[in-house]
């Protein structure tokens, strides 16, 4: 039996045990995971450094290396995320609706686990723990398929989590890492309908497209983040500058970083914003008017408006009004996160009604599109589709429902 099928069998069996556990049993297991990750951090960082060294040798971009790297600070955040998930209410068993029919049948809709979730992701070892903690909390088993570039890190993290589970009610086979990262095995995983209930791809456009186009297992699609900020005519100067700097520079390599800033042509502080960005080392690519007016702005191509840079590069454009900004976002956006900075409430309402995106912001950075920032604990991904879940996906997004019907002998006669 192949590694894939062997682990899929184990996961399916483990999911049946998981579905029967109490919230207390699952929370105790998550606390054990947090403690063991903390205790084994030296081993985890050592294995991560092997991936980092290989990545540098292979010429991975700074953005990819940043996503790949684990540090003590990032491990602290990962461990805190596990504990935050443990502290959240367990959605499993929640009665969503309840009613009684005229014939006396009492019907309940309750929340239940999905079953076995397949995670497909790139060089993001934090996803290994985030996904596992969310899945275990919701009674789901999880098959993790990371990238070759993060294999040492992922093996270490999964080994540590499995060690932690050995003293808990959750079987250690509820978490499995697919160590064969070949394309052929991935394609087989995408068609494992008898074992996997859903696939969740998390990564770049190529990875997501590959899963969506090749999977027969249902896909909960996450999307790339070509995020925009529209600085309206009434935007307050310092607020606008601080929001744009945060959205671009706090962590440029993530999907909720801003990639294009649209500036109202009558906003009086455009020069201040652009010069500040330039001084902070941001490469600016602008429309013809901006490229002509500022020697440090190169002229943008059509491709620039579509690009998720994941780097300190920013496309900038002057627009006549909120409607032109909305039109630009409709054409080039990826329905992820879009923001408007303005003191004009009419324009806020227009922007919120007209822009189709998972998350919309007024006077705030796009960087808040994140499960932890939304209060979900760690996130399984950020969905840009409209069915089942949209936006940062926390616990509820990886559950489904079933109906429980209580009778007293009723039979159907019509």
UniProtKB/Swiss-Prot annotation:
Pfam family, one: Aldedh
Entry annotated with the keyword Lipid biosynthesis: no
Catalytic reaction(s) noted: L-glutamate 5-semialdehyde + phosphate + NADP(+) = L-glutamyl 5-phosphate + NADPH + H(+)
GO MF entries: glutamate-5-semialdehyde dehydrogenase activity; NADP binding
Source organism superkingdom: Bacteria
PROSITE patterns: PROA
InterPro entries the UniProt entry points to: Ald_DH/histidinol_DH, Ald_DH_C, Ald_DH_N, Aldehyde_DH_dom, G-glutamylP_reductase_CS, Glu-5-SA_DH, GPR_dom
Pathway: Amino-acid biosynthesis; L-proline biosynthesis; L-glutamate 5-semialdehyde from L-glutamate: step 2/2
Keywords for the protein's UniProt record, in alphabetical order: Amino-acid biosynthesis, Cytoplasm, NADP, Oxidoreductase, Proline biosynthesis
The keyword Cytoplasm is annotated on this UniProt entry: yes
Protein's cellular compartments: Cytoplasm
An annotated GO BP: L-proline biosynthetic process
Signal peptide: none
PANTHER family: DELTA-1-PYRROLINE-5-CARBOXYLATE SYNTHASE (PTHR11063:SF8), GLUTAMATE SEMIALDEHYDE DEHYDROGENASE (PTHR11063)
HAMAP family tied to this protein: ProA
Function: Catalyzes the NADPH-dependent reduction of L-glutamate 5-phosphate into L-glutamate 5-semialdehyde and phosphate. The product spontaneously undergoes cyclization to form 1-pyrroline-5-carboxylate.
Annotated family: Belongs to the gamma-glutamyl phosphate reductase family.
Name assigned to this protein: Gamma-glutamyl phosphate reductase
UniProt organism field: Geobacillus kaustophilus (strain HTA426)
Chain's gene name: proA
């Amino acid at each position: 039996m192949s590694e894939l099928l062997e682990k899929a069998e184990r996961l399916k069996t483990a999911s049946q045990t998981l579905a029967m556990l109490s919230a207390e049993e699952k929370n105790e297991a998550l606390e054990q995971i947090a403690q063991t990750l903390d205790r084994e951090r030296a081993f985890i960082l050592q294995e991560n450094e092997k991936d980092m060294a290989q990545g540098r040798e292979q010429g991975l971009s700074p953005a990819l290396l940043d996503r790949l790297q684990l540090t003590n600070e990032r491990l602290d955040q990962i461990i805190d995320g596990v504990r935050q998930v443990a502290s959240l209410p367990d959605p499993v068993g929640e009665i969503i609706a309840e009613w009684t029919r005229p014939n006396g049948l009492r019907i309940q809709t309750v929340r239940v686990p999905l079953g076995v979730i397949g995670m497909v992701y790139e060089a993001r070892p934090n996803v290994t723990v985030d996904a596992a903690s969310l899945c275990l909390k919701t009674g789901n088993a999880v098959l993790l398929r990371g990238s070759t570039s993060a294999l040492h890190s992922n093996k270490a993290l999964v080994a540590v989590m499995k060690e932690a589970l050995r003293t808990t009610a959750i079987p250690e086979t509820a978490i499995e890492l697919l160590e064969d990262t070949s394309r052929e095995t991935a394609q087989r995983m995408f068609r494992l309908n008898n074992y996997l209930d859903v696939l969740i791809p998390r990564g770049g456009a190529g990875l997501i497209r590959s899963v969506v186009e090749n999977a027969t297992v249902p896909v909960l699609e996450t999307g790339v983040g070509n995020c925009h900020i529209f600085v309206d005519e009434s935007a307050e100067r310092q607020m606008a500058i601080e929001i744009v700097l945060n959205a671009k520079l706090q962590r440029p390599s993530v999907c909720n970083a801003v990639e294009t800033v649209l500036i109202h042509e009558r906003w009086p502080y455009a020069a201040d914003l652009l010069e500040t960005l330039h001084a902070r080392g941001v490469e600016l690519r602008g429309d013809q008017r901006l490229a002509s007016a500022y020697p440090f702005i190169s002229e943008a191509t059509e491709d620039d408006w579509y690009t998720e840079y994941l780097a300190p590069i920013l496309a900038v454009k002057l627009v006549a009004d909120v409607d032109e900004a909305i039109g630009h976002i409709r054409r080039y956006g990826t329905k992820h996160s879009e923001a408007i900075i303005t003191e004009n409430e009419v324009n806020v309402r227009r922007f919120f009604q007209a822009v189709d995106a998972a998350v919309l912001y007024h006077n705030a950075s796009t960087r808040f599109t994140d499960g932890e920032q939304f209060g979900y604990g760690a996130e399984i991904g950020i969905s840009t589709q409209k069915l089942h879940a949209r936006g940062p996906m926390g616990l509820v997004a990886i559950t489904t429902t079933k109906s429980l019907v209580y009778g007293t002998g009723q039979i159907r006669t019509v």
